UniProtKB/Swiss-Prot annotation:
Record has Transmembrane as a keyword: yes
Locations listed in the record: Cell inner membrane
GO MF entries: metalloendopeptidase activity; zinc ion binding
Protein known as: Protease HtpX homolog
CDD domains xrefs: M48B_HtpX_like
Disulfide feature: none
Organism per entry: Rhodopseudomonas palustris (strain BisA53)
Name of encoding gene: htpX
Amino acid sequence: MSYFKTAILLAGLTALFMGVGYLIGGASGAMIALVVAAATNIFAYWNSDKMVLSMYGAQQVDERSAPDLVRMVAGLAGNAQLPMPKVFIMDNPQPNAFATGRNPENAAVAVTTGLMQSLSREELAGVIAHELAHVKNHDTLLMTVTATIAGAVSMLAQFGMFFGGNRDNNNGGLGVIGSIAMMILAPIAAMLVQMAISRSREYAADDLGARICGQPTWLASALAKIENAAHQVPNYDAERAPATAHMFIINPLTGQGMDNLFATHPSTQNRIAALQQLATTLGIRAPQRAAAPARGLWGGAPRSRGPWG
């Protein structure tokens, strides 16, 4: 995702933010919203990654505390010709992962304990490679800033509902009606802006991630496991912050598996099919059997050789 497209997206969300401000306070409300949006954009550029990591209680690890995981990330980052990102672990039973950061030089990859406990080393490598593909494609800036701005739009919409909109403008009763419509439509509009870029971005990261780790079927197998678990193991942190759902490799929210207008991700079945087609195109045969789960990646598990280092 180019910086130009990022700027267009932020401009659209800023315009939506101003529109909500206008419904609350007329022209002065729109101007205040513009100032707040500009400040939020600047703050989000520099701090949104820290906010998201803190929101999920992610703890940074190094080669002493999580040697196998950090070495795996380092090896795959080398394959992708990327600087070594920071590595974080989230204490969450749902298998999932995301990447964040304003550029490859300031990137971070975060995985849940559930992911590390339920996937094989090969599957985990596929997931990490997918997240590094987001970093290489400069998707991480877009994902984190979008989550911050979309969350702000939703908060402002709720504020407008409680305070009843702008009753003193020339639109008469439209202020109350507008605030109700704003409460319903503004968060949806912000979500649709996120969804507009999410699907193609995930397909691109799947493709590049499979090439980074060297085996598309590893990622395909991981996606199937994560999708199945996401419907059974709730992610309460994500439920409290749905604006961040598009950042994860699989939608962490319950009941969102359909590939429809409001889905944060493409259909997992379609993603798996695309990866299987890529494996066929590259002439790569699927492994005979899956390896054992990658238990103990935060310290002490025996190392096995692989393309991750």
